[in-house]
């Protein structure tokens, strides 16, 4: 059997689910945005979460227009104007996919999160947090990805941490995936998370 990174994550995730309580998650609805700077594990965690819950995955990077991808590939940071149309499209995708969807999106600024919330009131966010050094190390290990390590500093410059922001859970992105899973699932079940 050939293991890809994603199938390895699913194997770990399934094991974690078998060893933990998922009671009550059948009633949980989203949608939920997995946010954070490049390299924090948005795609890996969102894929594992959607697999565990049976929800749909919306990979935000897949919705970037070619102009945005070309800029990032060239090492040019995106501007608010570059992201504006992309965020509208992501909000539309959330509406189309319904309440059982997980979106990956950096959502670095509060205005970006608010743009998504305009399309989906009471939208919840899981902020996977890590340091600049950890981000650079992780992004450097993604050969072939259009996001260049030189862009990490621009992400941290743009980041407005969602401190005391309603509907946001911040989690240490360096924790084991089963620990993140336990924190997120407990939060999703709590009435005060929305």
Predicted regions, residues:
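Extreme N-terminal, non-catalytic leader segments
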Residues: 2-29
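Hydrophobic anchor at the beta1->P-loop junction of P-loop NTPases
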Residues: 34
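P-loop (Walker A) phosphate-binding loop of NTP-binding proteins
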Residues: 37
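Conserved lysine of the Walker
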Residues: 42
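Conserved substrate/cofactor phosphate-moiety recognition/catalytic segment
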Residues: 47-89
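Glycine-rich phosphate-binding loop used to anchor ATP phosphates in small-molecule kinases
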Residues: 81-120, 128
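Conserved phosphate-donor/acceptor-positioning beta-strand/loop module used by diverse small-molecule
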Residues: 120-138
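Small-molecule kinase domains that catalyze NTP-dependent phosphoryl transfer to phosphate-bearing small molecules
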Residues: 141-185
